[in-house]
Regions:
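Short glycine/acidic-rich beta->alpha loop that forms part of the nucleotide-sugar donor binding site
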Residues: 25-28, 35, 45-46
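Short hydrophobic beta-strand element within catalytic cores of glycosyltransferases
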Residues: 40-43
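Short alpha-helical segment that forms part of, or immediately flanks, the ligand-binding pocket
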Residues: 8, 31-36, 50-51
């Protein structure tokens, strides 16, 4: 664990969040925090992380190792791609706040 101030500073410097995924992952706060900070994510097609990333918009959902590696390299080397996905991640964060979360939860209750 690191202090929140350090985590924020690390995300400000990050080009990409790389996470292979875990079959038992039910939320993946780390990817959520990265995306909320505007860091595009490259994730494996496994567990709940596929619900956090808008494939091709806020990051990449990689279906295999070659795609995962290529997407990571692309974010590190293609400034225009990084900028688009960075801005999309920030926009997605602003569109989902407590009122939206509460409404989504309430919609599940009959």
């Amino acid at each position: 664990p690191v202090p929140k101030s350090q985590l924020v500073a690390e995300f400000r410097e990050a080009r990409a969040m790389l996470y292979r995924g875990d079959l038992n992952e039910t939320f993946c706060l780390a990817v959520g925090e990265a995306q909320a900070s505007g860091v595009p994510a490259v994730v494996g097609d496994l567990g709940s992380v596929v619900e956090r990333v808008r494939d091709g918009e806020t990051g990449t959902i990689a279906r295999d190792d070659d795609t995962f590696a290529a997407a990571a390299v692309a974010l590190l080397t293609d400034d225009a791609l990084w900028r688009r996905q960075h801005e999309a991640a920030l926009k997605a964060r602003r569109a989902w706040g407590w009122p939206e979360a509460a409404a989504a939860f309430e919609s599940l209750i009959p």
